[in-house]
Amino acid sequence: MAFGALLALSAALGLPTGPTCTYDASTATVQAQMVSARTVVGNAGDGRILVDGRVCGTLAQTRQIVVASAFPPGTDTVVVDERHGRLAEPSSMRRPKVFALTGTGGDTMEVIGTAGRDRYVAYNDLGASIDLDADRAPDFVSTDVGRIVLRGMAGDDVLSDGRSGHDRLACGPGLDTVRAGSGNTVTGCERSLPRRHP
């Protein structure tokens, strides 16, 4: 049965259509299979990892989160949502690395910030990657991505994207600093420093 037909049948029968996820203790890995074109990974606010609202592991035990897609190229969006807390183990602030295995195409990586000060930096390596904690090491990596969206929320954020193209940087309340590559869209920002790298 085709994947799309399986989704339609699940919806008709009232079966859950959220992501399927497993935790592999031997590799400390959460594995999530996308069953819609947009998947959100976040912190429940208490150290549990949520994928589209379902508990899939804990930040204390998980070293990596792998999100895989079965959708056509260019249609996937994988979101790291930090509105309920950083996607990091609370005592050490150690982050699991998030891998978005979306295949080829112009897929989207998106980050939604915390209520405090955030520093997110997008890079053009390994397909595309985003540093979520200013340590110069990517925390969110995609195999092939056409667009990155960085959303600052409250707090004085630093959003930096040296990639040129179709990315979007959206600021929230606070005094934000933005460094955007040529061709990127910047919205809602009080202060913008275009085309400068961190």
Stretches with model-predicted labels:
Residues 11-198:
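Acidic, glycine-rich low-complexity segments
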Residues 1-14:
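Secretory targeting and sorting signals
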